[in-house]
UniProtKB/Swiss-Prot annotation:
Cofactor: K(+)
Keyword Metal-binding recorded: yes
Name of the featured protein: NAD(P)H-hydrate epimerase
All copies of domain YjeF N-terminal, residue ranges: 35-240
Residues involved in (6S)-NADPHX binding: 82-86, 154-160, 165, 183
The reaction(s) this protein catalyses: (6R)-NADHX = (6S)-NADHX; (6R)-NADPHX = (6S)-NADPHX
EC top class named in words: isomerase
Gene3D superfamilies xrefs: YjeF N-terminal domain
Keyword set, alphabetical order: Isomerase, Metal-binding, NAD, NADP, Nucleotide-binding, Potassium
Record-linked SUPFAM superfamilies: YjeF N-terminal domain-like (SSF64153)
Keyword Oxidoreductase assigned: no
């Protein structure tokens, strides 16, 4: 087989998977509570463990990051909850794609719980560099990077940001890197679009399952940038229940 054929195959396979993995049914904008209901029903009614939903979300986000920003190293900001767990998952898939990845975490791996702890331990075992937030952010800057991914706080958080989270977001906003938010920009209320004094300013927001109703509010686009919806792989029947 010629080198030309070999080099063409990965791109062909990825493009084919992009077509195959797009759900045939797209959900309308939803409140954060409705999204939590989808997660709960996927786990309870359809027997999908939360770690599978996180894996699906993380892999889908990593694939889209590869398309949106195919060059450069990646810094992923990981909070203590499931949004951070998504970030740890993304890091592993980007590493598999050959990207240079570093994680800046709000807590040590042994302080995390649940699915986020599992994904953090996998990332750590995979040799991904994980640095707990420290002096670099206190000095008002992040480690040098081309792309910064916001996996700090998810839909359960409400503005205003305080303490170390505010410091990290301010440092990210001061960076010249491409900024990508996971699910929702940290510092934004996903239902109202309300933002505090400090809110992550994304060039792209990769939101899971469905757009959030707050993204449609006046002024929200200044923080979300372009919004992309990532499937979390829930069954079609569940999508049908929430599409009306």
């Amino acid at each position: 087989m010629s080198p030309e054929v070999l080099s063409a195959r990965p791109g062909f396979v990825r493009n084919l998977m992009d077509v195959m993995m797009k759900p045939v049914l797209q959900l309308p904008p939803m409140t954060c509570q409705r999204i939590r209901e989808i997660d709960s029903l996927a786990m309870e009614q359809f027997q999908m463990p939360g770690i599978i939903l996180m894996e699906n979300a993380g892999r889908g986000a990593a694939e889209l990051i590869e398309e949106l920003a195919p060059e450069g190293n990646v810094l992923i900001l990981c909070g203590k909850g499931n949004n951070g767990g998504d970030g740890f998952t993304i890091a592993r898939h980007l590493q598999l794609a050959g990207r240079e990845v570093m994680i800046l975490a709000m807590a040590a791996t042994n302080e995390l719980q649940g699915d986020a702890a599992i994904q953090a331990k996998i990332a750590e075992a995979a040799g991904i560099k994980i640095q707990v937030v420290g002096e670099a952010v206190e000095a008002g800057r992040l480690p040098a990077t081309d792309i910064v991914v916001d996996g700090l706080l998810g839909t359960g958080a409400k503005p205003p940001l305080r303490g170390r989270y505010a410091e990290v977001v301010e440092a990210a906003n001061a960076s010249s890197a491409i900024r990508i938010a996971l699910d929702i920009p940290t510092g934004m209320n996903g239902d109202t679009g309300e933002t505090g004094e400090t809110t992550f300013r994304a060039d792209h927001t990769l939101t899971f399952a469905a757009p959030k109703v707050g993204f449609e509010k006046l002024g929200a686009a200044r923080f979300t940038g372009e919004v992309h919806v990532i499937s979390i792989g829930v069954p079609l029947e569940l999508l049908r229940q929430f599409s009306v």
